[in-house]
Amino acid sequence: MNRFFRRSAAIVILVGAVVAVVASGATARSSAKLQVCVLLPDTKSSVRWVQFDAPDFAKALKAAGVTYSITNALGDAQKQVSQADQCLANGAKVAVLTSIDAGSSIAIQKKFAAAGGKSIDYDRQVVGGIAKVYVTFDGKAVGAAQASGVVSALKGKSKPVVAELWGGPTDQNAFWFKSGNDAVLNPLFSSGKLTKGPQKFVPDWLATNAAPIFTQMLLKTNNKIDGVIAANDNIAGAVIATLKAKHLKPIPLSGQDATPQGVQYILAGWQTMTVYKYVPDEAKAAAAAAVALLKGKKVPGVNGFRKNGSKQEPTVALPVVSITKANYKRLFTDKFLTKSQVCVGAYAKYCK
């Protein structure tokens, strides 16, 4: 079964049934005691959780020969707590957690610890949590790539106004990405080469929240925004929809996650770039960490630490790649996306 159809199956499992998917390695029975509990956050902040993370975790954990469950909380923090409770009742010893909010996530991690289990922060750091390791992409590099992409596209323009739409304020990742944005943009704002435009966090990373925020930004500036740092493709899509609704032209615009729609917008000239994070590597790294914790071994791949309250959290930080019109085909070569997902309908003419 190819990657596209595996993702479609994941959508049915995670969104249609909204139950834990308990699976096992090739030699284990499905009734075996649960070992690893993967807790994903939602289906709206990004398509990645359903289309990429869920099937990639299933593949990695099955290959590791451990029993596992994969659930999606659909943006409901209490649902995620209930899913974690069910995992514990089924014997799970390791939680791979993508946080919805810090309070509920800390509660989940404490419950696992009380039961003799361990936790992994996956993609989002739980500030104040007690995870043994944080598996993520290099957040500062993500933000720097976004800002650099927009700045490059603004070359030749005098003191362009750059607006920023950061991610959800309850997600520590949003602050990592912002720090990368700041590292590139702040010196240019200070020197007067760029003009600082409106800046806002987008609650829950939702396009439905980003659209009215960006609409207000345009009203505030009389439509004089020359470029936008959008934290991910979802938010970038809201910017594009707003520009189109106001009959405004495309402007330099960043994204993240290399979603099919994000790549389509890049090909059509509406989005400048997206940050490509090869999710199979992240899922594989988290699966390897989970297996190591199950066996009481050292977590492989730790290459640094991230401050978490008063402590330094061991971190597996993975590299990222900027995707533009010039190199989008890499996504097909890597089998991250298929041509049939991107080069279809009105966008087929842009693919060569």
Model regions: which residues?
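A residue-level marker of the well-folded mature domains of exported/periplasmic proteins
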Residues: 3-7, 21, 26-352
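Bacterial N-terminal signal peptides
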Residues: 11-21
